[in-house]
Amino acid sequence: MDIFRVLTRGASVKKDGKQVDFSRVQSQRTARPGQRGKDEDEEQLSRELDFFRTRRSVPAAAERPAEETGDAHRDETEQDEGAEDVAPPPRITTAEEASQLRRSYRGKVTGADAPLPIGSFEDLVTRFKLDKRLLSNLIENNFTEPTPIQCEAIPISLQNRDIVACAPTGSGKTLAFLIPLLQQVISDKAVGTGVKGLIISPTKELANQIFDECSKLAQRIFLEKKRPLSVALLSKSLAAKLKNQIVSDKKYDIIISTPLRLIDIVKSESLDLSAVKYLIFDEADKLFDKTFVEQTDDILSACSHPNISKVLFSATLPSSVEELAQSIMTDPVRVIIGHKEAANTNIEQKLVFCGNEEGKLVAIRQLIQEGMFRPPVIIFLESITRAKALFHELLYDKLNVDVIHAERTQVQREKIIERFKSGDLWCLICTDVLARGIDFKGINLVINYDVPRSAQAYVHRIGRTGRGGRKGTAVTFFTKQDAIAVKPIVNVMKQSGCEVAAWMENIAKMTKREKEMIKKGKAFVDRKQISTVPKILKQKKRQQKEMIEASKKRKLAQQAGDASEEEHA
């Protein structure tokens, strides 16, 4: 098909300079021998735009029986309900085809009786009778072809199997668990049982994002007695309403929450999770580490349905976390796309040696001068104090910048994220609070101002760029103090297919002692304050502060002495 002819259709002008009157019906021209007619051309265009092959083939009016054409006022909705979709055959039908598809995206699937992957979203209609309204919402949101993790995870989930899934950042993991979750809730015939699906996220920002995506796919979907499918984010206000019994927990089909808030509401007996059949842990490596593992255990205890399906998704999957996760599952299927410790291959990764802390500020200003600082940019630091300090330093460079961290209120964080997404902010300085799952469109550059504390943290940080098939760049600054901490990052770069210089190869080799130091967090040191103030000025300020404090102490001592003299007198 000539795409230029299609794009210019309706834009032609008559040779005499007069515009074509498109309000009149044009007479149908007869196609020359060897050429397609207009109807054939339109039919081919329709077929190419019908991604999911859901369009019904309706005969032309001239070819219909007389009694069929005579009923001009027939209700279209009745026609839709009466007609049956003829779904196309699935693209993947044999184990050999599945193996070939998996080789194309380096996918590894292990587990008893793992189902074949899907080759397209059309396969969901053929193999699993995907709900028409859910399919329509997918089309409206421009989801036309499944990503590798979606090809594998969706059919496994639709067979109610437990999953441990690992795929690179920005590879479509959210959709991989939302599509089967919504389909299973729609298919569930149980009425008035309460929450059926539960999604756990380690951060509020990620929970918000999942809620937005789930709400888009759940639009205009009705369950029993024309009740709309209800998705809720367990916010502070909703938690208060549940505690005060202003709303019933039976009202919601799917709830998305962070662990601590969910445990709090469950312990108050305001939310019953005994009917949950589909439990999803997003960013499972974080939820199963020592920070959240107790809360995760409490959630698993509250979800007591005998036929519950557990699904775990993450961009990184350490062996310790995987062992713990598999211990709570029944006959799970393990899905790995690429390497479980590798970063997204669309990201160009760089290491920059800065010598010391002062050199980092020089390096970031050099990036700005050389034109490598192309907005939008995210800069990660290891602490709130350092994030604030860098924010004040970059304000002097007249950058359109803001900072986000755990000390900001939820409203402030949401406003900053909205401004960054809309382009009002060019640069966002943050801690690891934004390192996981948040999908910012078109991030060009990620800067690790401080070396991440683990290979997993590094993969999640740089995963804010290179999402959805786009290219991105990640730059990591390191100093002499980071000699050990930078070694896991070099290994991630090698596994991701990045070019690694000879000097990097040498520092990448870790001894057993160094591995233990990194695991225990002893490879990381206390860093100096971020500042360009000269040392002599800092010393003067410190001396001035000491003088003021000494003066205050003398005054207090004098006042205490005067008071004791008055008492004796």
Curated annotation (Swiss-Prot):
* CDD domains assigned: DEADc_DDX52, SF2_C_DEAD
Query: Which GO cellular component terms, listed alphabetically, does the Swiss-Prot or TrEMBL entry include?
Result: nucleolus; small-subunit processome
Q: Helicase C-terminal domain: which residues? A: 346-508
- Where, by residue number, is the motif DEAD box? 282-285
- Extract the ranges annotated as region (Disordered): 15-106, 536-569
Provide the reaction this enzyme catalyses. ATP + H2O = ADP + phosphate + H(+)
- Where is ATP bound in this sequence? 167-174
Q: Where is this motif: Q motif?
A: 123-151
Note whether ATP-binding occurs among the keywords. Answer: yes
Single GO MF descriptor: ATP binding
Domain Helicase ATP-binding per the UniProt entry, residue ranges = 154-335
Which portions of the chain have biased composition (kind: Basic and acidic residues)? 36-53, 64-76
User: So what EC number does this one have?
Assistant: 3.6.4.13
Q: What is its main location?
A: nucleus
Q: Which GO terms describe its biological process?
A: endonucleolytic cleavage in 5'-ETS of tricistronic rRNA transcript (SSU-rRNA, 5.8S rRNA, LSU-rRNA); endonucleolytic cleavage in ITS1 to separate SSU-rRNA from 5.8S rRNA and LSU-rRNA from tricistronic rRNA transcript (SSU-rRNA, 5.8S rRNA, LSU-rRNA); endonucleolytic cleavage to generate mature 5'-end of SSU-rRNA from (SSU-rRNA, 5.8S rRNA, LSU-rRNA); maturation of SSU-rRNA; snoRNA localization
Q: Where in the cell is it found?
A: Nucleus, Nucleolus
- Pfam families linked: DEAD (PF00270), Helicase_C (PF00271)
Could you confirm whether the keyword Endoplasmic reticulum appears in this record?
no
Q: Could you list this entry's UniProt keywords, alphabetically sorted.
A: ATP-binding, Helicase, Hydrolase, Nucleotide-binding, Nucleus, Ribosome biogenesis, RNA-binding, rRNA processing
Free-text function comment from the UniProt entry: ATP-dependent RNA helicase involved in 40S ribosomal subunit biogenesis. Required for the processing and cleavage of 35S pre-rRNA at sites A0, A1, and A2, leading to mature 18S rRNA.
The text of the family note is: Belongs to the DEAD box helicase family. DDX52/ROK1 subfamily.
**How is the quaternary structure described?**
Interacts with the U3 snoRNA and is associated with the 90S and 40S pre-ribosomes.
In the UniProt entry, what is the domain comment? The Q motif is unique to and characteristic of the DEAD box family of RNA helicases and controls ATP binding and hydrolysis.
Q: What is this protein called?
A: ATP-dependent RNA helicase ROK1
